Amino acid sequence: MEDYTKAEILIEALPYICKFHDQKFLIKYGGHAMVNEQARSWIAKDLVLLKYVGINPIVVHGGGPEINRAMEKMGKKPEFIHGLRVTDEETLDIVKMVLIGKINGDIVSKLERYGGKAVGLSGKSGQLIKAKKKIQYLMKDSQKIEVDLGMVGEVEHVDTKLIDILVEKRYIPVISPIGVDHQGNDLNLNADIAAGDIAGAMDAKKLIMVTDVDGIMDDVNDQSTLHRRLTISQIEDMIEKGLITGGMIPKIEACINALDKGVQSVHIVNGKTPHAVLLEIFTEDGVGTMIVRE
């Protein structure tokens, strides 16, 4: 690559660096995007670079595949309803062990390896996430019935003070999605939905979902059907047509929730694409799907 071409690539990022300087970006780092060591390095480098050019990344991570593996090793079969993990007491212990005890620390170490300053948290830290037990309903024989997900929660309140302090001190907060109810009980939170709630509470400019798909497509096997930009109404139409199903539904709910709470745009990118976060933010075309209100 010629020097001029290298300079052109850098200059393309300048308007975006100026536009987003001192803004908060919530990065939801999905468990399926963590399975590749090279991909983990790309994401870590991207986040450290964001911090050094004056953008404030805040990370919420999942860990579904590792939780599933840990459960299977212990003889438990993972169970999901509408993309949400059914969580009994033993499952919750496994979830906390994997998320807080392993994945969170791994992400912090990776960020620090590439020159960043990072701090690992969970929703339990400093009463960060107050949650309540989630009530889930299903349609059966044209009737709405309540199903018990166990110790699964939904966010009631996010206390941003601790995150604000860390961001001001130039740290990258890395948050495990475990909440606490008013009786002090731990609750398992869907990482996508928690990320949307935290993004809204933090007045984040963007929510970026780093996962293992390129974005939202009409046909997951046909890259040419990738949507670069969608509105909420277009998303809802795709759900009605059955083009968005299963585990993607909580992601979309999180996206819409974040937009409803003031986040300006949500982006879904593939963590296995080299430096997907930088390419989505700092180039005109991006590499994933951007979702906006209208």
From Swiss-Prot:
Location within or outside the cell: Cytoplasm
Enzyme class of the recorded protein, top EC level: transferase
Enzyme Commission designation: 2.7.2.8
Record: residues binding substrate: 63-64, 85, 188
A GO BP entry: L-arginine biosynthetic process
Pathway: Amino-acid biosynthesis; L-arginine biosynthesis; N(2)-acetyl-L-ornithine from L-glutamate: step 2/4
One annotated Gene Ontology cellular component of this protein: cytoplasm
Site (Transition state stabilizer): 28, 251
Residues that span the membrane, as ranges: none
A Pfam family assignment: AA_kinase
Gene Ontology MF annotations: acetylglutamate kinase activity; ATP binding
Keywords: Amino-acid biosynthesis, Arginine biosynthesis, ATP-binding, Cytoplasm, Kinase, Nucleotide-binding, Transferase
Main location: cytoplasm
Catalytic activity: N-acetyl-L-glutamate + ATP = N-acetyl-L-glutamyl 5-phosphate + ADP
HAMAP family assigned: ArgB
Family: Belongs to the acetylglutamate kinase family. ArgB subfamily.
Function of the protein: Catalyzes the ATP-dependent phosphorylation of N-acetyl-L-glutamate.
Protein name: Acetylglutamate kinase
Biological source species: Methanococcus maripaludis (strain C5 / ATCC BAA-1333)
Gene: argB
